[in-house]
Amino acid sequence: MAYIPDGGAPTAGAIPLGSQCCVCKVELSVSGQNLLDRDVTSKSDPFCVLFIEDNGRWMEFDRTETAVNNLNPAFSKKFVLDYHFEEVQKLKFALFDQDKSSAQLDEHDFLGQFSCSLGTIVSSKKITRPLLLMNDKPAGKGVITIAAQELSDNRVITLSLAGRKLDKKDLFGKSDPFLEFYKPGDDGKWMLVHRTEVIKYTLDPVWKPFTVPLVSLCDGDLEKPIQVMCYDYDSNGGHDFIGEFQTSVLQMSEARDGVPLEIECINPKKQRKKKSYKNSGIIILRSCKIHRNYSFLDYILGGCQLMFTVGIDFTASNGNPLDPSSLHYINPMGTNEYLSAIWAVGQIIQDYDSDKMFPALGFGAQLPPDWKVSHEFAINFNPTNPFCSGVDGIAQAYSACLPHIRFYGPTNFSPIVNHVARFAAQATQQQTATQYFILLIITDGVISDMEETRHAVVQASKLPMSIIIVGVGNADFAAMEFLDGDNRRLRSHTGEEAARDIVQFVPFREFRNAAKETLAKAVLAELPQQVVQYFKHKNLPPTNSEPA
């Protein structure tokens, strides 16, 4: 049975659930019981997909792993969401039987779904509900259980493990070992926390290091027991038990690089039957590192300032500002699309800058007295002090400069990008997470210096800097989408790849009839992630942060 979510095919990647500077994150654990059996010769191979409602459309957020040949799966992959008390966050959990390796959901059999708000799950802590068909009628079989846990502890643990001389389980070959980690649940039963990858054809596996939130592994309690199970993978889902052991984070933390911790893997049945039994192999904990996974809010609370600069397009294609058809025409309500974009972004960002003094620059205009074209001028006509006091100051300087300049061209972005990048480069000399620069460019048309702009953006991607581009009017903004590296990483004309995606482009026309906060959410959606990504890459913790 094919499945297409309401509103069309899902969008890959995570959808930001509002602002990322919320108070807490919530982790959702999903399991299924008595699911429909869609396979003829074996049991279903279920996986769960989480959709989030965004502007009336269901958008794919994430997927669990596939539980092979299992009608009662407990998925080790968790869904981690930002929780906002003031918003109704609608969620849909859909279960599928994996038939092919395709990422397209209509290639898999639909097993059922359940929809509710995040608040419903959080207030109940754990809910169990019957699965429904797409028409909201009962699926006939199968229930879903969703448990919520607040991730208020931002510590994460990275474990690197290996095995030595594990029991051979395959008749004509060696074992295909993997590990499962469990913690005690509230109901007294062991709860699956993490499953490693399978290492094929070996009795001496080396697993990839993995990182999980400390609260997921042990509820933040370093002494809480952790059960580790070792299995030999079987493609039909009937994995062979190799052995087990119990440990704790406190014990595992004894392992350091160069000083591994070795733990015997015990099969209790073999131990009872054979007096000569020693173990079923050794699990080697090569390293255990606990560190903090800092959030955007951690950096803001740590004193990081968001340094905001506005760049405004004054090219002739905007039209004469005295003409009501001009994009720079200020209507009787005292606004236009340029001012709306400045207000939408600036009103939020100004709260994160203590002095609220923002440079406001223009490009593409001829300036008095000699009427030379400039692509990097202060709109208050004070090149030594281009700062405006708050968003109000930017709006006032913008309105005041319109009668005194001549709109011209071309539409060159690179001078303003390089202008802000120079200040961002100076900030890196401090080697602290105290400043992050945001450039808002508002423009009506096609970039003239695309080659130079690509190079400037690639260089800026190495700095504490993000670029927001708001396109006003009805021009073709295909080039802007190219700079916004959501689908593929931007490269300069020399072939150098951007260190990270720092450009967010939004066409204003999509928000003309929407609430003003809608534009702000869209424009600022990627910013918290970009801030964290930069400081994390540079190994810069928030100032005054506590050790893990």
Curated annotation (Swiss-Prot):
Keywords: Calcium, Cell membrane, Cytoplasm, Membrane, Metal-binding, Nucleus, Repeat
Localization of this protein: Cytoplasm; Nucleus; Cell membrane
Domain VWFA as annotated: residue spans: 305-507
Outcome (variant: residue 176 to N): Does not inhibit calcium-dependent translocation to the cell membrane. Leads to the constitutive (calcium-independent) attachment to the cell membrane
A Pfam family reported for this protein in Swiss-Prot or TrEMBL: Copine
GO CC entries: cytoplasm; nucleus; plasma membrane
Effect listed in the UniProt record for changing residue 232 to N: Leads to a reduction in the amount of calcium-dependent translocation to the cell membrane. Leads to the constitutive (calcium-independent) attachment to the cell membrane
SMART domains xrefs: C2, VWA
Reported cofactor(s): Ca(2+)
Residues at which Ca(2+) 5 binds: 170, 232, 234, 240
Region (Linker region) residue spans: 247-304
Binding positions (Ca(2+) 1): 39, 45, 97, 99
Residues engaged in binding Ca(2+) 2: 39, 97, 99, 109
Domain characteristics, as noted in the entry: The C2 domain 2, but not the C2 domain 1, is necessary for calcium-mediated membrane association. The linker region is necessary for calcium-dependent cell membrane association.
Record's function text: Calcium-dependent phospholipid-binding protein that plays a role in calcium-mediated intracellular processes. Exhibits calcium-dependent cell membrane binding properties.
UniProt protein name: Copine-2
Native source organism of the sequence: Mus musculus (Mouse)
Taxonomic lineage: Eukaryota, Metazoa, Chordata, Craniata, Vertebrata
Gene: Cpne2
